[in-house]
Amino acid sequence: MTDTPTKQEIQSKNDNVPGATPVEQKKNNRNDRKRNRRGDSKNLERDSDWQERVVQIRRVSKTVKGGKKMSFRAIVVVGNEKGQVGVGVGKAGDVIGAVRKGVSDGKKNLVRVPLTPNNSIPTLSLGRDGAANVLIRPAAPGTGVIAGGSIRTVLELAGIKNVLAKRLGSKTPLNNARAAMVALSQLRTHKSASKERGISLEQLYS
């Protein structure tokens, strides 16, 4: 039966190599710091790909037994402009906390968007959320993002450069942003659409 090492022994193994000279121990510690720094830089590069935009910040209240409890609600859109985008909502007692929660919620609800070579969408799509309807159409190169409000923010952070969007129904920023997300989630490439329908690309275009 082998003896289990104590916490002090494990810590000493992690900090210093047994039997090593002070010069070797210093070199090992330097290498560990380099590895940690390299890992931190990779995480920073990964985080720098994402952009965050606050669509709306509102002060909301909740009636409780002792009176009204005030807090802030933030609607945040996150995306990497490479075909991934998400919408999140956060509530907290301060604005910074609400935005931070909104960013975290948005990264949990990401949607992957198929992009064409000219940074448009492959097909027309209609998304609905509550009383909001959003219609998005592909556009020719040089058209730009023809949309407004929270819909424009969602499309831009998804990496779409040429698109036509129309808001139908409700003007609520949250419902419109979520309706745009539904429309983007329904998009399919021509190849995947033909595969789902069991027909060839020639039959799809005919």
Swiss-Prot record:
Pfam name, any one: Ribosomal_S5
Any Gene Ontology CC annotation: small ribosomal subunit
Gene Ontology molecular function terms on file: rRNA binding; structural constituent of ribosome
Keywords tagged on the record: Ribonucleoprotein, Ribosomal protein, RNA-binding, rRNA-binding
Region (Disordered), start-end ranges: 1-50
Compositional bias per record (Polar residues), positions renumbered to this chain: 1-15
Function: With S4 and S12 plays an important role in translational accuracy. Located at the back of the 30S subunit body where it stabilizes the conformation of the head with respect to the body.
PROSITE patterns: RIBOSOMAL_S5, S5_DSRBD
Quaternary structure annotation from Swiss-Prot or TrEMBL: Part of the 30S ribosomal subunit. Contacts proteins S4 and S8.
Name of the protein: Small ribosomal subunit protein uS5
Feature: compositional bias, Basic and acidic residues: 38-50
NCBIfam families recorded: rpsE_bact
Keyword rRNA-binding found: yes
SUPFAM superfamilies in the cross-refs: dsRNA-binding domain-like, Ribosomal protein S5 domain 2-like
Entry similarity comment: Belongs to the universal ribosomal protein uS5 family.
Domain S5 DRBM: 50-113
GO terms, biological process: translation
Notes on the domains: The N-terminal domain interacts with the head of the 30S subunit; the C-terminal domain interacts with the body and contacts protein S4. The interaction surface between S4 and S5 is involved in control of translational fidelity.
